[in-house]
Amino acid sequence: MRLTRCLPCLLALLTPAMGRAANQAATAPVATLSSFDTSELALFERKASLAKRLGATHVPLTDGLPVAQWQFQPADDPYPGWFIQRPDFFKLFPASEVEPFVDMTYGRRIVTLLEERCRILRRLGLKAHWAANIPQVMPEAFFTAYPQLRGPRVDQPNRSRTARFSMCVDQPETLRLYAEAMKNLLRHCPEIETFSFLTQDSGSGFCWAPALYPGINGHSDCKDRPMADRISGFLITLKDAAKQAGHEIEINLNPISPRQWMLATFSPEQLDAIVHKLPPGIAVQGREGPDGRPFGGLRASDAYSRGAFYPIVGLAVPDLRWLRSGRGATTRAGADPASARRLANEQAERNAEAPATPTAVRRMISLRPDEAEMEFNARLIESTQGSARGSVVDRLAALRAFAATEAGDAQADELLAVWLQLDDADRRLDTLDFGSMLQFGHVLNRWINRPMVPFPAELSAADKAYYRPFLFQAKGEEQADNLIDIQAMRMYEGFGARLLFQRVIETVVPDAEGALSHIRHIRDAAPDASAKARWELFGRRLEAAICLLHTADHMVAYQAQLDRVKSLAVKPEPNPPLGTLNSWDRADLTELARKEIDNTAHLLRLLQTTKEQLVDLAPVAEEETIMRLGPGLPDQLKRKIDLMNAHWMDYDRLFTAPNP
């Protein structure tokens, strides 16, 4: 059955760009890869080869692809920043009816990259895994053209400026379009064998699920249809489409793990009913049909996971949780301990450590964005895998032996101390994670480059132009000017929160500084220039991380004091008597401002005097997004310093000026 369109609405809403995309889809050849894309393919091959060396049979095909910036519609809505990181095969390999509503120029580029990645995997004898959100939002113009397919509203209302909807998977037309997209995907990428889908988060969701962010909602037609029928029917459609295309696939649907304040996607009764309707090879929430056994397939690769010190790159350290809990994970780089999604990567690493057996064992190893971290993990696994199931003493001895291969036997204890201290720092930072604190603060809220001034609302549009468009802020300027309003989460708000935040930072920084001291000892004792350069770079990256810790502390403290002072509404004395001293709160704010200026200048010097990468930056300005810092960061840090220095006199409008 072909879709029927609402033609007047369609003609009114389709943009010229969409029209061009449709024409291009019919006539344009396969995309020609840029030199940047070619270099990224070479990086993918190096990582995939490394994964194979470690025993991988599968690698994620979707990790590290260029993001779909065309989905920032309208341009000032930050919410797409969450879902564009996970490629949607429905938009990349669309049925003909869908083509006019997606950017086919972008799509051809990504399809070409995926095909080339598959050729690499074919050459290496590896298979592919696909990770995405599903069912993902569609552009509003699509639903205007096909109103019968509009499913639930799935955006987070406090983080989006636009109501965003996914498709209703109960509609036969939706199932047909998804089946066609699946067949198209597997025709281009035949190496894919396994799928993991996140749902109920980041622009995805099913009708009438209790956990939908705007509240339970959906298409009226399916309100009374059992959830088990709807979810199982959709997933079985995808598996059947793959079979019709000549492929046997496995699917694992993963609802977001609810935090304390969130509802579960499916009730226990709903989950049981869904699982019993699934065939083998399909799982929901890690339970495979039809009997609910633990899913035996490959786990998800999490594109969001960046590591406790992100946006700093290259700070790879072993995961030492086994030292305290007896768990078997061995590497931490690239993993966010506060996130339940991290468990997928840990499982892949545990699989990678397992000794080879005569039977066929499938292993997936994630291709993390940071190549240096992945190489470190590989060396660690290869060096210590023999002790992975040994006693704590055995494992510590193996770790010390690995440290000797990294820094030399004389410096092995120094390096072991570095790892212990950074592991402690990482663990303490967990307390502040509502999502990785450094990522949420410095990237989503641009603490790293935005100024701390008493009256941020008075900054001009030109003053804010370098950071304001990249704040994850869907509300107004009042919220955008608040340093701790991070995507409508004010978890660090108030003086009490300031003290708790400060307590965590004051325990983390000494560990980081202690690790830096050990790194400098290792550097000074290094036997040659190459080794000295390696440890010098590690030290500079650690210095940059310490700068970000200080900035985070300053931002939270500054906003707490600023809110307190403004709420008191005490009018400054216009003519203070001789002998008037500086008030404690004025001294607090101005000292915080000066500390942050000096701290930012330190970070700027580090960036200016280091040729290698310290911070993850987009390669070109056009690829800076809410989720990634841009290559202009050094200039932006200078701009931050200049703006803060230009507003010293503003403090006299908040406080009585001292007159000693």
Regions from the PLM with identified roles:
Residues 19-23:
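Boundary at the C-terminal end of the N-terminal hydrophobic targeting segment
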Residues 28-157, 162-423, 447-448, 452, ...:
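Catalytic-core regions of glycoside hydrolase
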Residues 1-5:
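Positively charged n-region of N-terminal signal peptides that target proteins for export
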Residues 386, 390-660:
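Catalytic domains of carbohydrate-active enzymes that cleave complex glycans
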